[in-house]
């Protein structure tokens, strides 16, 4: 089998990068639609006087921030020269675990394990932002 030339490999990489960019752009637009739907849902939950709606409101707020963080991640990808910064994934992970604690807090051991996971992610975030792991 004949190896591909450098120009062909670059052409393939360019095609795949464009497909990735188009997919992320589509995902961003879908997330904006979901963000709008979540805004309407939050407005509905805000004006319902029942106690159960307060939990729904808090859960909706955290979901809202997850959508917002994913959209911010996609924006950052395009602004930073087609690169995903690691710390944005860590922020999303922390927010997702906080949502899980709010929604599913059945046993104290689960909450403790989720809290330990958040602590691990915060330590990861600290290491990523420290000078030890900074890129040149």
UniProtKB/Swiss-Prot annotation:
Disulfide bonds: none annotated. It is a multi-pass membrane protein. GO terms for cellular component: plasma membrane. Keywords: Cell inner membrane, Cell membrane, Membrane, Transmembrane, Transmembrane helix. Residues 36-54, 104-107 are periplasmic. Its main location: membrane. The keyword Membrane applies. PANTHER family: PROTEIN PSIE. This is Protein PsiE. It comes from Salmonella paratyphi A (strain ATCC 9150 / SARB42). The lineage of its organism: Bacteria, Pseudomonadati, Pseudomonadota, Gammaproteobacteria, Enterobacterales.
């Amino acid at each position: 089998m004949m190896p591909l030339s450098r120009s062909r490999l670059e052409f393939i990489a360019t095609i795949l990068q464009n497909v990735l960019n188009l997919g992320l752009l589509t995902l961003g637009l879908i997330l904006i639609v979901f963000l709008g739907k979540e805004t309407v849902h939050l407005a509905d939950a805000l004006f319902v006087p029942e106690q159960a709606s307060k939990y729904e409101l808090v859960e909706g707020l955290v979901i809202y921030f997850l959508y917002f963080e994913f959209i911010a991640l996609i924006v950052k990808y395009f602004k930073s020269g087609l690169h995903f910064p690691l710390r944005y994934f860590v922020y999303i992970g922390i927010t997702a675990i906080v949502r899980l604690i709010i929604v599913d807090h059945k046993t104290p051991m689960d909450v403790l394990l989720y809290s330990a996971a958040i602590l691990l992610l915060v330590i990861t975030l600290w290491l990523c932002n420290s000078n030890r792991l900074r890129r040149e």
